From Swiss-Prot:
Record's protein name: Histone H1B, sperm
Chain intervals for the UniProt region annotation (Disordered): 76-119
Bias (Basic residues): 80-119
Annotated signal sequence range: none
Cellular component annotations (GO), alphabetically ordered: nucleosome; nucleus
GO molecular function, one term: double-stranded DNA binding
This protein's UniProt keywords: Chromosome, DNA-binding, Nucleus
GO BP, one annotated term: nucleosome assembly
Entry-linked Pfam families: Linker_histone
Length: 119
């Protein structure tokens, strides 16, 4: 049995969604435009991938991931998995040394100065 070679392109589902997002057509991208995009950017034989592309598009429309408008398809933004924001690492709080309590000046009752006799 021959070993299966790893594909040089991403999975069809990923590539089609990337194509639709990359084309940025307001009303959606046609199947022809999607195939042209895949051929140009992923260097694949679109004639061979045609059935896989059609199957994915039908499945994605049924699941609500893509929205079909006549012959065009656009990505349903609400159905896309949201990218998780990288969890922010809590910053190590600098341990503040408590300031030494300011010494309160105490007004001591001082003994009145006595005049020295200079005799």
């Amino acid at each position: 049995a021959r070993r299966k070679r790893a594909a040089t392109h991403p999975p069809v589902a990923t590539a089609v969604v990337a194509a639709i997002l990359g084309l940025k057509d307001r009303k959606g991208s046609s199947m022809v435009a999607i195939k042209k995009y895949l051929a140009a950017n992923y260097n694949v034989d679109v004639a061979r991938l045609g059935p896989f592309i059609r199957r994915f598009v039908r499945k994605a429309v049924a699941e609500g991931m893509l929205v079909q408008n006549k012959g065009s398809f656009r990505v349903n933004k609400t159905a896309l998995p949201k990218k998780k924001k990288a969890a922010k690492k809590p910053k190590a709080k600098k341990v503040k040394k408590p300031k030494s309590a300011a010494k309160k000046k105490t007004n001591r009752a001082r003994a009145p100065k006595t005049k020295k006799n200079r005799n």
